[in-house]
Amino acid sequence: MKYADILLPVPLEGFFTYAVPERLREQIAFGMRVLVNFGPKKTYIGIVVRTHDEEPKGYKTKDIIDIADSKKQDR
């Protein structure tokens, strides 16, 4: 399983880890904007800050919904 840490525009510190669905695994990369669910009803566009294979402990991850752009954002 592949995971991505996502920076979201919310007033909370840190990144949020999401599972990368099989259909997006070859495309997802640092700096891309992605569409994710946050909480029970919110959907946000966030930025991928890291991809990895480390399963988070203590909670079940949500899947990334889709990629918002076709290219990475510059730093």
Residue ranges and their predicted role:
Residues 1-75:
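Accessory, non-ATPase domains that flank or precede helicase/AAA+ motor cores in DNA-metabolism machines
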